[in-house]
Amino acid sequence: PAVIHAPHHGHGVNPCAPAAYDNRPIKEIEAYVEEAMSQTLEAADVLGAETIVLHAGRYEPGADAAARETFAGFLDRHSDPRFALENLPAVYAGYPLLGNTAKDLTALAGETITHFCLDFPHLACTTNYRGLSFTEELERFDALNVTHHHLSNIRRGSITDEHLELDHPEGGLDLNAVVSRLRRHPAVPTTLEYKEDSPEVYARQARVFAGLWEGHARGGRD
């Protein structure tokens, strides 16, 4: 089935802090968000999508509590059982983002959202930024109802998600830990995400992914 990704702050929809980093009048922002989310749900209906991936968004430094409260209000207005809340990197381009770890997502979801999207490079960026163990934070997602995965690569030690290829020469994502999780959850779909909107790039990366999968099955570390 199709998977829908709701518009995020890069598209003008920033659930946890609609006016942050946005010069548009607040009324214009609110009207735009309403229309964009209506179109998102309509697209999911038309395509029969069972999953709508959602970002909590970015916020001004020091406004974490307000961002959490605003996101809760967003869910009150736009709740849908198909929402899958995605973990975001702790920071990007200098601004903080909301919902970085399994613990964060659980708190944000409350009883409203019951599905989650695990983005592996986002988690790696977060653990690099906070000095946490990637494998330990990854294991904490076992307690969540993860219904979708996002996969690409990041540079070694990076805190910035660049959607690099899996076989990038400077790649630093722990692919062995990632593939180990994927093999434990084979029914959960995985989307490969790259900057290049090219069929050739995705076709080659699908082959790279297949090699990682087969290599892990043979007991190799890729």
Where are these regions (language model features)?
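Acidic (Asp/Glu)-rich catalytic clusters
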Residues: 1-11, 38-48, 70-80, 106-113, ...
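Hydrophobic faces of well-ordered beta-strands that scaffold small-molecule active sites
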Residues: 2-6, 52-54, 83-86, 116-119, ...
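Active-site beta-loop-alpha junctions enriched in small/polar residues
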Residues: 7-9, 57-59, 88-92, 120-125, ...
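Active-site acidic/histidine proton-transfer and metal-coordination neighborhood
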Residues: 13-115
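Gly/Pro-rich active-site loop or hairpin
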Residues: 15-34, 95-99, 122-187
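A broadly tuned preference for mixed-charge, low-complexity surface segments
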Residues: 54-61, 104-107, 170-180, 200-206
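Short amphipathic alpha-helical "recognition" segments used for binding
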Residues: 90, 166-169, 197, 209
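C-terminal helical cap(s) of enzyme catalytic domains, especially alpha/beta-barrels
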Residues: 199-220
